[in-house]
Amino acid sequence: MSAQNYHAGLHQSSTQRPPKRPNTEHAQEPPKRALIGGQTTPSSSGGGQTPNGTNYELEVKQQLSNYQKLFDQATYPFIRDVSTYEKLNKIGQGTFGEVFKARCKNTGRMVALKKILMENEKEGFPITALREVKMLEQLKHPNITDLIEVCSAKSTGTTGSKDRATFYLVMALCAHDLAGLLSNPKIRMSLVHIKTMMKHLMSGLNKLHRSKILHRDMKAANVLISKDGILKLADFGLARPFVQRENGAGPRPLYTNRVVTLWYRPPELLLGDRQYGTKIDVWGAGCIMAEMWTRQPIMQGDTEQKQLQLISGLCGSINKDVWPNCVNMPLWSAMSSEPNSALPQGKYRILPNKMKNLMKFDAPDSKTDPFGKNVKQHDSATDDDALHLLEILLAIDPDKRPTSDEAEDDIWFFKDPVPMANVQDLMDTIPNSQFEYTVGKGAHANRGRHQNAQQRPNQQQARPSNAIPAGQYRDTIF
């Protein structure tokens, strides 16, 4: 039946039988959605060809190239060009970009420029960088790094080259990072310095968690110290908001498991947990606290299996007695299988004995040294309160670790010597920036007994790397 007869039938008496539906078996498909340039996508039976006979995959690649060209040539009227700043030297490598020391040409202010790596991005501005910008704008706190502005640099090369449009996060410049500071044997820290920096660390982490944000890459290299002695959490490239369930009700959300640099990764992540919470950051804070005394990462594994073995060797065997929920972890069976189990049994917790010999300090003289600035390490009483805090921060069972709020209010911070407002007196004794020490001399590469390094996150995979350079490292506990 033709369309003309069909429409004519609509005007006939309603008592007549309605016309049959038109036969659509061989009807022409409606036109597909147009791509840029007015051409249409192929039908499912078109064998990968567009109506004009061109290859569809090539067509899509061309359109993506057009999109990238538009992105590279775009102007951003509400952000300044990075030429406002003069780059001086490279001072670090973050999770998702390089970091440069720079000077504002207009004001002379020294800043840090964090370049957002765009070489492997095919869909414009990376979502991880958008997250970082949004969170830093939200997190205004003395112990969290400051975001000043976002700048851009126009593309200087052809589309598809590495010189495409680039963006920079302009941050307040800090004089040192904690990894570089701890790697320099000439820098001596007193108990009050350690206590002050740990107070700052817990305060910043508590602000993060109260704002419903997970850092997910706690390590000494991501802790900065300003020239006036204020410690600041930095590098939010892996951070993300989290959902806090009311009274534990409702399903627990799933997050990506491949987060946190290996040496600071807690046992639940190593066992495949994807329903983790703030306690993964608390474990990292515990690793950093121990590092204040050991001056090197305390558990240096080169694989996830070796890292679990080192945790068991230092903190005791992982089993249902110390962590009832461990057998429910996704990788429990795989990691505990013989003959090369990553979860050795019969291991005792030796962390207290290893640390108590390092945590011995004189009590400060209340008359000549009321703030404990000149407290020295030697054979006197162990700081039991510090040891207790470290013990619970590094609890195998995440439910037995304190929250960052509880850790910030731990009794250790209220015992003499109490934390100071800052560690500027320590900063005044350090002539050169420890970023230069870290980047220029390879402080991370010189940490530990075996001339290895704190691993850097894998830039292309956008997650912490498990890879340790072959031949440079052997698994070790401090």
Swiss-Prot record:
InterPro entries the UniProt entry points to: CDK, Kinase-like_dom_sf, Prot_kinase_dom, Protein_kinase_ATP_BS, Ser/Thr_kinase_AS
Compositionally biased residues, Low complexity: 451-464
Composition bias type Basic and acidic residues, residue spans: 22-32
Enzyme Commission code(s) on record: 2.7.11.22, 2.7.11.23
GO cellular component labels: euchromatin; nucleus
Keyword list, A-Z: ATP-binding, Kinase, Nucleotide-binding, Nucleus, Serine/threonine-protein kinase, Transcription, Transcription regulation, Transferase
Main location per the UniProt record: nucleus
PROSITE patterns: PROTEIN_KINASE_ATP, PROTEIN_KINASE_DOM, PROTEIN_KINASE_ST
Location of the active site: D217
Record region (Disordered): 1-55, 444-478
Catalytic activity: L-seryl-[protein] + ATP = O-phospho-L-seryl-[protein] + ADP + H(+); L-threonyl-[protein] + ATP = O-phospho-L-threonyl-[protein] + ADP + H(+); [DNA-directed RNA polymerase] + ATP = phospho-[DNA-directed RNA polymerase] + ADP + H(+)
Binding site for ATP: I91, G92, Q93, G94, T95, F96, G97, E98, V99, K114
GO molecular function terms attached to this record: ATP binding; cyclin-dependent protein serine/threonine kinase activity; protein serine kinase activity; RNA polymerase II CTD heptapeptide repeat kinase activity
Segments forming domain Protein kinase: 85-413
Listed GO biological process terms: embryo development ending in birth or egg hatching; germ cell development; nematode larval development; positive regulation of transcription elongation by RNA polymerase II
Subcellular location: Nucleus
Chain intervals with Polar residues compositional bias: 1-17
Cited function: Essential member of the cyclin-dependent kinase pair (CDK9/cyclin-T) complex, also called positive transcription elongation factor B (P-TEFb), which is proposed to facilitate the transition from abortive to production elongation by phosphorylating the CTD (C-terminal domain) of the large subunit of RNA polymerase II (RNAP II) and spt-5.
Quaternary structure, from the entry: Associates with cyclin-T (cit-1.1 or cit-1.2) to form P-TEFb.
Record-stated family: Belongs to the protein kinase superfamily. CMGC Ser/Thr protein kinase family. CDC2/CDKX subfamily.
Designated name of the protein: Probable cyclin-dependent kinase 9
High-level lineage: Eukaryota, Metazoa, Ecdysozoa, Nematoda, Chromadorea
